[in-house]
């Protein structure tokens, strides 16, 4: 087996490739590892770096936290690079970048798409990471993000994002980890709120640039609802939606119903968390977000008369979206099976009381019931 080439040669080759976006674009079209290495060797010779194909192949390693990283300056990366993972630990912090090449994100969650992209030879040869502190120096969104989706958990947000992903000119990022990590950074390190906001602006700006001419929709993870004001500050003209559902059905899904699984929080704790989400969701609606109930979700996303997130979508793509609505959002190879009645039936009196007394008073204003 070939040993990795001398670091100096590898560093020179990587630097040469990074400085030439057209080269990266050409390499992205070559998924075969050997053909990719052949082309890299040819490009290297043109840049004055002579490396054997075997050495290039040896330098292409699977991406992961233990992968020998390639430190870069985030500001020097082309728009095709996207923040894929932000890690903050007691040992330090790193922001991983993945070259996306303008590809669509079609998996239920962005992390799955980033993992797929990371297997491309280009991302294995160029395992780019940067100091998260540099996010503050990156430009924020240069245009408004086209839509953001918040939710109070288990209420169809993945379905909404999967439906929108059927439209070629819409890039949908479903719960990108880097955004959630920035929003929770203050729980792990001491960080000035203004710096944290600058980090958020930098991540969002990178995603907007990666979208290019496509419209960008971001579906946030559930706890990001608590930070809706920060996200609105980063892109104040963005249409927002808050998805919700009957609190008993969510509570059953989050607790396991009358037969809870070991390791889950007590139902009372889950109920208080859901109530807090509903209160925050109602505040987001008061600030201009659109509330959407689970039972109306598919019809709302497909409605041409009052477009969801103000997104204009033609009838042909609406037909594709409708077809996706008949599938399980998180397991697209399966047909969707309605589960509302089953969840209601799985609730014991304890859960019914919590849904009625703890969550209900917070959910009803969000749902427009009072």
Predicted regions and their residues:
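Generic alpha-helical segment signature
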Residues: 3-6, 33, 193-197, 274
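PAPS-dependent sulfotransferase catalytic domain
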Residues: 83-87, 92-94, 100-101, 105-298, 302-316
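Surface-exposed cleft-lining segments at the edges of enzyme active sites
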Residues: 146, 215-216, 263-268, 323
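A polyampholytic, Gly/Pro-enriched intrinsically disordered region
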Residues: 191-202, 259-266, 335-345
């Amino acid at each position: 087996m070939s040993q990795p080439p001398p670091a100096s040669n590898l560093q020179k080759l990587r630097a040469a490739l990074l400085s030439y976006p057209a080269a990266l674009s050409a390499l992205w079209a070559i998924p075969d590892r050997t053909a990719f290495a052949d082309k890299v060797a040819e490009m290297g010779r043109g840049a004055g770096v002579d490396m054997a194909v075997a050495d290039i192949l040896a330098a292409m390693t699977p991406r992961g936290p233990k992968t020998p990283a390639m430190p870069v300056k985030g500001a020097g990366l082309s728009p095709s690079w996207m923040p894929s993972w932000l890690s903050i630990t007691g040992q330090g912090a790193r922001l991983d970048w993945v070259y996306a090449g303008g590809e669509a994100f079609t998996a239920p969650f962005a992390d799955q798409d980033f993992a797929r992209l990371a297997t491309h030879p280009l991302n294995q040869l160029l395992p780019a990471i940067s100091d998260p502190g540099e996010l503050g120096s990156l430009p924020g969104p240069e245009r408004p993000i086209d839509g953001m989706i918040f939710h109070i958990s288990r209420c169809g947000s993945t379905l909404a994002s999967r439906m929108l992903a059927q439209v070629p000119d819409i890039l949908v990022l479903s719960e990108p980890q880097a955004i959630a990590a920035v929003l929770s950074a203050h729980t792990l390190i001491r960080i000035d709120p203004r710096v944290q906001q600058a980090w958020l602006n930098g991540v969002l700006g990178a995603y907007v640039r990666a979208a290019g001419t496509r419209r960008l929709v971001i579906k946030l993870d559930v706890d990001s609802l608590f930070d809706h004001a920060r996200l609105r500050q980063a892109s104040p003209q963005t249409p927002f939606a808050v998805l919700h559902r009957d609190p008993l059905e969510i509570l059953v899904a989050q607790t396991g119903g009358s037969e809870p699984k070991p390791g889950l929080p007590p139902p009372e704790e889950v109920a208080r968390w859901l109530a807090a989400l509903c209160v925050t969701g109602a505040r987001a609606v008061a600030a201009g977000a659109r509330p959407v109930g689970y039972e109306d979700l598919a019809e709302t996303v497909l409605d041409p008369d009052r477009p969801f997130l103000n997104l204009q979508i033609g009838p042909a793509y609406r037909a594709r979206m409708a077809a996706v609505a008949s599938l399980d959002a998180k397991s697209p190879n399966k047909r969707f099976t309605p589960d509302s009645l089953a969840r209601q039936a799985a609730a014991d009196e304890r859960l019914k009381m919590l849904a009625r007394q703890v969550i209900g008073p917070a959910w009803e204003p969000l749902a427009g019931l009072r």
